[in-house]
Regions:
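Long, His/Glu/Asp-enriched segments that create or flank divalent metal/ion-associated functional microenvironments
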Residues: 1-195
Length: 195
């Protein structure tokens, strides 16, 4: 697989470029797919996992790697952590707004105060976000919800290691997670408990 960088994308700031590459390329989507195909290939045991789409798993992993990439960037670590938290808060807010729109029937005027709190005040911007959320329900939930599920799996894996007096490492968890996916989080949690 290859990752194409459009010339216009290279003009973006280094943080956005670095985190986008982490999300889309290495260690995000591209790495996850290459890992699956190179370690398991497609066989009778996993053909359904190969054919089916598990957006919470794949977007959860990609967002996890994106947010993790902030800690590997050069520069002021406090500032990088602030940027990471800002990204996470934005995604969380978009999930909340998505739920408010599709569950509670929230309107543009209902969501504008939430967006204003994070600096989005221009009516055209608020309308664009509202329109996107209306037309693409659940989009941000697969990212942020998948990420939160991944963090639950990570904590479950860590506790399992501790209960069995095994040394926990992020590397071991990452390998376990990638070897057991793509799949539902229910199945991954069951695999952790049965490992």
């Amino acid at each position: 697989q290859s990752l194409a960088c459009k010339e216009s994308g290279l003009k973006k700031d280094a943080v956005e470029l670095f985190t986008t590459l982490a999300h889309e390329g290495f260690p995000g989507h591209m790495y996850q797919n290459v890992y699956f195909l190179s370690t398991q290939g497609v066989n009778k045991k996993n053909i359904l996992r190969y054919c089916m789409d598990f957006p919470g798993y794949s977007e959860g992993w990609a967002l996890y790697t994106e947010l993790l990439s902030f800690s590997y960037m050069d520069g002021d670590k406090t500032y990088m952590e602030l940027l990471r938290l800002s990204r996470e808060i934005q995604l969380c807010l978009l999930c909340i707004l998505d739920i408010r729109i599709h569950n509670d029937g929230a309107t543009v005027s209902d969501i504008s105060p939430y967006l204003a709190r994070i600096g989005i005040k221009e009516p055209v911007d608020v309308e664009n976000i509202y329109s996107y959320l209306v037309n693409e329900p659940g989009t941000y939930l697969k990212y942020y919800g998948g990420y939160l599920e991944l963090l639950e799996c990570k904590e479950l894996y860590r506790k399992k290691c501790m209960s069995e007096d095994k040394t926990y490492s992020d590397l071991n968890f990452h390998e376990f997670f990638l070897e057991h996916g793509p799949d539902t989080y229910i199945n991954i949690k069951a695999a952790i408990e049965n490992s």
